[in-house]
């Protein structure tokens, strides 16, 4: 094989891997492959001024301001690289553009790793897939609450959990009720005794299946209005007499996209995990990055639907996609939602999927 081709292939792989590397060397790697005179940096100061105004950003000192401006410029470079590697989506300036990669992970992700399933978890039964619709969206059927905002607290797992149970409760009762994430943040400390670091721990991360286990053991969850979200860890104030939704059972869906779609249609929105490496710069469109590690799951989200395709002129084809409800507020992505390619487990979106059934309730 031609040596020049091998070298070019190696260089592409190295650069692509650097884009999604979770180490703290992201910015250093980026500087190696991007010309310092990139035209999109010529107006960086103007972009930063607009960014501060749009997202109400302020900094206590000039030193902090100047530091954040430097981070912002690095993230402009990162967004351009993401655009090149994920051309079917739009990447650019977001509410997270003044955060380093490590700050973003620490403050806005929070999914923990787990090798074993909780005691009450079971494998979801195999469902028929022959009559699946081409498009499906639980938002159109009234089973999804408005997009919420976890703030700078690693509680994504709690929002994924409540979102799935909100949908299941709607299917069981016909009532859409916003459930309390703060109850999970404060009260859920379910652990796997055989795996170190697997405990749900509020703003320091957790797992959706752990949370379903907690809800089974505790008797359920109260409404959001009865236990409001604060975005920080607190003492448990759970009042069982105010429970409005409870878990009957929960299951883990096999790594098969047709089965995931079938479970979504039959059982309601699904709690899923994802590698969020491309989400810091995501603005809109169908995200289908060339490289995104499937095993590096670090963010809990809610799968609410799917579409048969959005035209991608760069790739000359329709790209079928999943519709993901995120918990970063409505001023991120597509009014708080994320579209990601279906078909090949992009960013591990098919790797950790759970469905929950709600108990019938008289509330």
Swiss-Prot record:
Domain of life: Eukaryota
Active site as annotated: 156, 299, 326
EC number: 3.4.22.-
BP terms from Gene Ontology: proteolysis
Enzyme class, spelled out: hydrolase
Signal peptide: 1-18
Alphabetical UniProt keywords: Disulfide bond, Glycoprotein, Hydrolase, Protease, Signal, Stress response, Thiol protease, Zymogen
Propeptide residues, chain positions: 19-131
Glycosylation sites: 249
Induction details: By dehydration of shoots but not roots and not by heat shock or ABA.
A GO MF term: cysteine-type peptidase activity
One Pfam family named in its UniProt record: Inhibitor_I29
Disulfide bridge partners, by residue number: 153-203, 187-236, 292-347
Homology family: Belongs to the peptidase C1 family.
PANTHER family associated with the record: CYSTEINE PROTEASE FAMILY C1-RELATED (PTHR12411)
Protein name, UniProt field: Cysteine proteinase 15A
């Amino acid at each position: 094989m031609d040596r020049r081709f091998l070298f070019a292939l190696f260089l592409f792989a190295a650069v692509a891997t650097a884009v999604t590397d979770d180490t703290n060397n992201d910015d250093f790697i980026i500087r190696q492959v991007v010309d310092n005179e990139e035209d999109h940096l010529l107006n960086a100061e103007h972009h930063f001024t607009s960014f501060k105004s749009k997202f109400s950003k302020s900094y206590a000192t000039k030193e902090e301001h100047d530091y954040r401006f430097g981070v912002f410029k690095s993230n402009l470079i990162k967004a351009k690289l993401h655009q090149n590697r994920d051309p079917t989506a739009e990447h650019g300036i977001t509410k997270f553009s003044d955060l380093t990669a490590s700050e973003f992970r620490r403050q806005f992700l929070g999914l923990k790793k787990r090798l074993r399933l909780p005691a009450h978890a079971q494998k979801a039964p195999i469902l028929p897939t022959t009559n699946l619709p081409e498009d499906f969206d639980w938002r159109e059927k009234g089973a999804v609450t408005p997009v919420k905002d976890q703030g700078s607290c690693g509680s994504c797992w709690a929002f994924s959990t409540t979102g799935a149970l909100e949908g299941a409760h709607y299917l069981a009762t016909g009532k859409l009720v916003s459930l309390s994430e703060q109850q999970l943040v404060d009260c859920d400390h379910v652990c796997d005794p055989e795996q170190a670091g697997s405990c749900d721990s509020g703003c320091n991360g957790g797992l959706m299946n752990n949370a379903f286990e907690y809800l089974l053991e505790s008797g359920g969850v109260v409404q959001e209005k009865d236990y409001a979200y604060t975005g920080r860890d607190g003492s448990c104030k759970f009042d069982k007499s105010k429970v409005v939704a409870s878990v009957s059972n929960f299951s883990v869906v096999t790594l098969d996209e047709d089965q995931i779609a079938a479970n979504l249609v039959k059982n309601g929105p699904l709690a899923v995990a994802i590698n969020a490496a491309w989400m810091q710069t995501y603005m809109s469109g169908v995200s289908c990055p060339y490289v995104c590690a499937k095993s590096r799951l670090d963010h809990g989200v809610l799968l609410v639907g799917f579409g048969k395709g959005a035209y991608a002129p760069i790739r000359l084809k329709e790209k079928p996609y999943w519709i993901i409800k995120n918990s970063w507020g409505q001023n991120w992505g597509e009014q708080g939602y994320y579209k990601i390619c279906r078909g090949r487990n992009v960013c591990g979106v098919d790797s950790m999927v759970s469905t929950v059934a709600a108990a019938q309730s008289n509330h």
